[in-house]
C-alpha cells in the first residue's frame, strides 16, 4: 500500500509532505506531546532508532500529532529538545485534526481518536509503520507466515514482550530498516 498524500507543518514551521521523504526509508507514528502512557516508550524507542541511523541521510521519521490544538510547532520544538530528537529528517507534524485522523485511520489504518474516558483524552495506536524508498508501507512475515504489517513501538527497549518471543519488535524493526537501506547497495 502506498503512503497517501499529506501536507503538514513541522516543529520548525516547515511544510512537510510525503515527497519530503522521497527516496528515504522512514517510520510513521501517531502521538501527542501530553500523552501520559504509550507515547513515552514509543518516542524513547524512536530516539534509540534515530541514534542508530543518525549518519544515514536515507532514513527519516514522520511523527504526526493527534492533538494539533495543543501541539503547535513551538510545543513540538520543545518536545524535540526534551527527548533528544536531533535528526533533521525527523519531522514532528501538526495540522488540521480531521486531516491527521483521516491519515491515521484510513491512510495508515492506525487508530487515532479523541476519547474523554481515558487518561490523556486521546486514544491512538502504539504501532509504527515502515515505509520504503518508493513510498510503500512494508511488512514481513511472522514465524507462522502471517504478514506483520506494523511494529509494536510501545514496549520499552529491552523489556520483555510477548511470552515466547525471542527478539524484540524494535530489534526486528531495525533489522528491517537495515535491509531496506542496504537493498540498493547490492
Question: Residues of each region from the PLM?
Answer:
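Short active-site neighborhood of thiol/selenol oxidoreductases, capturing the structured segment around
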Residues: 16-46, 61-62
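Structural micro-motif
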Residues: 90, 101, 108-113, 123-129
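Thiol-/selenol-based redox modules, centered on thioredoxin-like
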Residues: 118-186
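Short loop/turn microsegments at loop-to-beta-strand junctions
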Residues: 3-4, 26, 125-127
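N-terminal "domain-start" segment that seeds a small globular fold
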Residues: 1-19, 44
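Structural microenvironment flanking redox-active thiols in thiol-disulfide oxidoreductases
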Residues: 43-103
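Second-shell loop/turn segments in exported
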Residues: 28, 32, 64-66, 90, ...
Amino acid at each position: 500500500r502506498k503512503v497517501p498524500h499529506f501536507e503538514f507543518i513541522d516543529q520548525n514551521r516547515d511544510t512537510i509532505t510525503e515527497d519530503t521523504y522521497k527516496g528515504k526509508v522512514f517510520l510513521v507514528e501517531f502521538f501527542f506531546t501530553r500523552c501520559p502512557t504509550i507515547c513515552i516508550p514509543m518516542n524513547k524507542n524512536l530516539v534509540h532508532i534515530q541514534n542508530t541511523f543518525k549518519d544515514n541521510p536515507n532514513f527519516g521519521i514522520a511523527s504526526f500529532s493527534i492533538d494539533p490544538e495543543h501541539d503547535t510547532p513551538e510545543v513540538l520544538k520543545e518536545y524535540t529538545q526534551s527527548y533528544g530528537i536531533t535528526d533533521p529528517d525527523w519531522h514532528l507534524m501538526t495540522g488540521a485534526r480531521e486531516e491527521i485522523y483521516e491519515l491515521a485511520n484510513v491512510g495508515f489504518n492506525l487508530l487515532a481518536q479523541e476519547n474523554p474516558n481515558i487518561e490523556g483524552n486521546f486514544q491512538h495506536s502504539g504501532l509504527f509503520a515502515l515505509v520504503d524508498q518508493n513510498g510503500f508501507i512494508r511488512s514481513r512475515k511472522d514465524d507462522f507466515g502471517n504478514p506483520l504489517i506494523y511494529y509494536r513501538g510501545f514496549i520499552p527497549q529491552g523489556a520483555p514482550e510477548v511470552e515466547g518471543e525471542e527478539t524484540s519488535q524494535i530489534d526486528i524493526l531495525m533489522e528491517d530498516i537495515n535491509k531496506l537501506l542496504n537493498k540498493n547497495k547490492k
